[in-house]
């Protein structure tokens, strides 16, 4: 049913796109649509004043269970760039990519080229999902400052490749933000390495990368 619904939504999006007026060139800035908040934050920090960056999945909405509306797909199609983290997180992205014209909107996968850890099944920690969430690969990369840097670098490099005339701005912005993430990484390393207790308990097994990078042990309940 989801597939049929998305086909209907895609057709509606085409109609909305045909009727709407794109704002891509009104202020001379790029229009970038991002999926959920970490991707939005990283992209906004890199793009700076060169782009209008839009957040698709609003705060309080479960990313896994989110389904794009016709208007959402139209927003993606009308954008210059669409940025997402990983299809194991935004499970709906593949169907969206099939429904849009990727010759007109650049798609950036922030985890491109990264080696991901095996995923896990979660059956009890999301009451709104009957079957829980199952990830072939763990997508929660951004929760480790050390790996968040790689996401920022991928977004930076992808934007530079597409818009080389804005290279200096993207690289300068990214460097400033990476410096902050480096400082956070150092603080995590120094503080957590001194911790006597290395185990922590969590209901949502999303911290495997953080645990691996800082010598901790995640225990799921």
What are the language-model segments listed below?
Residues 2-10:
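Sec-dependent signal peptide recognition
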Residues 5, 15, 19-221:
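Extracytoplasmic metal-acquisition and chelation regions
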